Amino acid sequence: MLVEGELFKIAEEIIPLASLDNKNIEIYISEINLSARGFIRSIANILEKGAVVLIDYGFGRDEYYHEQRNRGTMMCHYRHHAHDDPFYFPGLQDITSHVDFTAITDVAVGEGLELLGYTSQAQFLINCGITEILSRIPVENTSDYLPMANQMQKLVSPAEMGELFKVIALGKDNQQSLIGFENGDKSFLLEKDM
C-alpha cells in the first residue's frame, strides 16, 4: 500500500539520479515499482530467520539510471515480438520492466533485513555447480550432452540471460554462507549508494 506522500518522496530520491550533470538529455522517463517495496516489507515482516533469494533482470542504481535508459526499461512482449507500446495489444501482451536492485536493498535494509549477496545469474549458477552438473554427462553422448549444454549456455552466457539477470539474497539472522555468492559477489555496487 502506498502511504500518502510516498510517491513524491521516491521521486525526490530519483530525480537527482536521472539528471546528473554529464547527461545531455532533456527528458528522463523511469518506472517506479511501488509494489516491490510492499513485497520486500512483507518478506521482512514474515522472515524470522534465514534467507530469501530473488532472481530477476535488472541493475543496480548506477546502471539503472544510465543515460541510455532515459526512456525507462519497460518492454512489451507479444508472440515472441518485443516492443515498447503498452497500448498496442492491451490485455494480450506481457509488460515488463527491470528491477532497481539498489531500491530493493534500500527498502530491505530499512526494514531490518541484511544484504547477503548480489551477483549475476551466471556467477550464481557457476558458484552453485552448474558446470559440474554438465561435466557428469559424457561429451560423446551428444543426444544428452548438446541439449544440456545449450540450456546451460542460455542461462550463463552474457549474450543471453547470464549477465542481464541478477541474483540478490536478503536475510535475517542467517548463520550459513551462501555458496552462490562465494565468488563474484557484487554487493558493494548496491551498498555504495546507501
Model-predicted regions and their roles:
Residues 11-194:
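Long, Lys/Arg- and hydrophobic-enriched amphipathic alpha-helices
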Residues 1-13:
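Short phosphate-coordinating micro-motif centered on Lys-Gly-acidic
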